[in-house]
Amino acid sequence: EEIDKEKRGTQITLFLKDPEEGDQDFTEEYTIRHIVKKHSDFVTYPIIMNVETSEPIPENEIIRGKDGKPIGETYRKVKKDETLNSMKAIWAKSKDDVTEDEHKEFYKHISHNWDDPCEIIHKKFEGVTEYDVLMYLPSKAPFDMFRAERKHGMQLYCKRVFIMDDCKELLPEYLGFVQGVVDAPDLNLNVSREILQEDRLVRNIRKNLVKQIFSVLEGMEDEKYIQFYEEFGQALKAGIPTDYDNKERLASLLRYKTTKSGDKYVTLDQYIENMKEDQKEIYDITGENLASLLNSPLLEALKAKDYEVLLMVDPIDEWVTQSLPEYKEKKLKSAEKGDLDLEKVDDEKKNEYSALLSFLKGKLESKVKDVVVSKRLKNSISCLAGDEWAMSAYMQKILKASGQKAPDQKRALEVNVNHPVMEKIKSVFESDTTNPVLTDYCDLLYDIAVISEGGKLDNPSRFSALVGDLMAKSI
């Protein structure tokens, strides 16, 4: 139908129902402002609304009394047009045309952070499909980084029109801390979470975004990367069990302190470069803190061989070691599990202690699966070690602390047959196998092993009494 109009263009009139209780009122100024700001802040055309505001009455229009004071109101209500959208889509600009201050302002706008970004990734992808990408690597980790309900930082736009935030389909879970925008003009607007997961364009975008992030991280200067890693290293580690395609590349980004590095971090590549000629495996140990790991009896034989050991103190490291059995053809080997195979046990010593070891095993059968001559110990008297595929002591501790049931598994008690105390225990055993003090020695050997790994004793009072009794006898 043809109509007469003063101006060219399309006019759309919406007729709204009266809002029911609890519904949004789309005639309210605040609601309209919020919708425009969220969905259309960056469209290239101005969105104008006629709003009511207050302005001061001009001086020559104010009525004053004899005392010179104004009579009546000094402000009046006026209607005026106001542009609601900023139209500043900095991701659509050329990289060189965006200033550092503009980046800082936009980063704070989308992230709600007060700090400046650590790195900026601003790129236009061209080819069969085109899309603009602007991503920021934060400087500080959010307090809720590992909460399941935490929102992802990526927003999805189509031709500058907001589609969705918290867009988990654009980046894998472990990179959810990255803040930014993807504007894909060719995106199907009939979009939903389910459709996005299957969308070929979105999968392609995701793949390229991950590549870009890795390239930036790999190109960082060491000092800057360490600052970033101390904030987000645990997030990168979380990608090892979940991102099979990028596992090797993620592993190259990991950093660990070692038995030789002091306060410095070491990469897996640097570790391999520093390996001894006769060393075949990458050794690691997990635990609560560096101090306890550095002094762990489990490392004595490795230190004696001058082998370096990775010290893993983040809970997520337990999943890293399970999901990363090897790196660049070098097997990762736990210092507390399986046979370290560093040296052979003296057969003569083994036979010499076999009766005592069988006795100890019988006394401790409710706590350990075996009692064996240790290949790990050089100075300490005892330690606990698991099978090759057993759960580590730290992993069991993590599960218990989180309220989960840890599998009931027994480990082997390893004893140092070259320790002078073991020689005395053997002497007592050979003199009288029924001597009640042997039971005390059994309990002490086990309790010492538990304490040395930071474990909790079942009966600390008995341990204290036994130690006190031994001290009294030795004085």
Where on the chain are the PLM-derived regions?
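Conserved GHKL (Bergerat-fold) ATPase module
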Residues: 1-475
